[in-house]
Structure formats: C-alpha cells, structure tokens
Amino acid sequence: MKTQFAILLIALVLFQMFSQSEAFLGGLWKAMSNLLGKRGLNELDDLDELFDGEISQADIDFLKELMS
C-alpha cells in the first residue's frame, strides 16, 4: 500500500512538472514567434523613430523650459 501511494505521488509530481513546463515553453514559443514573425518585425520598424540620436534646437528649447 505504501509503495502504491509513493508511486501515485511521484506520478502526480511528474505530471505537474510536465504540465507547467509545457505551458512555459508554449508561452516562450508564442513570444518568440510574435517577435520574429513578419508582423512583429513590421511593428519593430515603427519604433526606430523613438531612438533617434539627434537632438534638434526645438528639443533643447523644450528641455530648457522644463528645467526652469
């Protein structure tokens, strides 16, 4: 009886580990496919304007206005 109970507990633990890892790997796969898919790459192109390294005179004036 003790052996059967131990086998049942081990089976439940292994099943729980498998189901959690499957959900984690599924979420990871979905995130990677969204980033690397055609639509994901098109959306990343829109973010290039946010990382523009040039600062215009209007930007400097706005920052001075914020500082005062």
Curated annotation (Swiss-Prot):
GO terms of biological process kind: defense response to bacterium
Keyword Thylakoid: no
Keyword Calcium among record annotations: no
Tissue expression summary: Expressed by the venom gland.
Position of the signal peptide: 1-23
Keywords for this protein: Amidation, Antibiotic, Antimicrobial, Cleavage on pair of basic residues, Membrane, Secreted, Signal, Target cell membrane, Target membrane, Transmembrane
Annotated GO CC locations: extracellular region; membrane; other organism cell membrane
Domain of life: Eukaryota
Record localization: Secreted; Target cell membrane
Main location: secreted
Function of the protein: Amphipathic peptide that has antibacterial activities.
Protein's recorded name: Cytotoxic linear peptide
Classification of source organism: Eukaryota, Metazoa, Ecdysozoa, Arthropoda, Chelicerata
